[in-house]
């Protein structure tokens, strides 16, 4: 038996997909006074790593661009000009039309060391939360001591956290991999022996409902090649609102 959790559409502030992508970019990175990306925005500062030199978020409503702090001003202007000339997005899964030009501009400054991208999702208005999911707190964090020892040590940083428990141990968890004032992004993991049983979808739904109940927007993203993670999004009923490309 599942219970319906979440806000009615009428309770949500008017926002298009480009606005939502902007909130996601603001949530996923830290910034300097110029609005340039510095580091990834994990709740635990020790887990943060240097931001890419370029984040391009694409939606049917328009683009969102963030440039890394290491990029010279002239390069930042060049990247933004290239993206401004892109045609409207017709297929989110297709590479950006300007990808080759962006690579060339970045490579003139420094070699490209990493490239990534994938879909970004929002949660539906009503989120069904399976009753078997357990919220992790200080009182029961022993559930992750053996299976997720890093989470046992850092539980307070990654809240809210939810788990599916088998034989007294957490076998799947969802936590806040990024956390901001307006939104949070899901991080999900299932032990290999327990994959393919719907546990990841269950904990993700519970996490999304909790973030929404806190007055923030729950978000989920993954890489195009991560078919298992995209499958979780389908099972939870998440709605793809955009896609991103990152170049470091």
Where in this protein do the model-derived segments appear?
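Acyl-donor-binding surface of acyltransferase catalytic domains
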Residues: 1-143
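Conserved GNAT acetyl-CoA-binding A-motif
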Residues: 66, 211-223
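Short hydrophobic/aromatic beta-strand or adjacent loop that forms the aromatic wall/cage
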Residues: 116-120, 159, 244
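Short, conserved active-site entrance elements at the starts or edges of catalytic domains
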Residues: 137-162
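A conserved beta-strand-loop-helix scaffold within acyl/acetyltransferase catalytic domains
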Residues: 153-160, 165-166, 170-183, 188-191
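Residue-level detector of high-confidence beta-strand sites
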Residues: 173, 241-243
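Conserved acetyl-CoA-binding loop-helix of GNAT-fold acetyltransferases
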Residues: 186, 196-210, 230-235
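Conserved beta-strand-loop-alpha-helix junction that forms the acyl-donor binding cleft
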Residues: 220-234, 239, 247-248
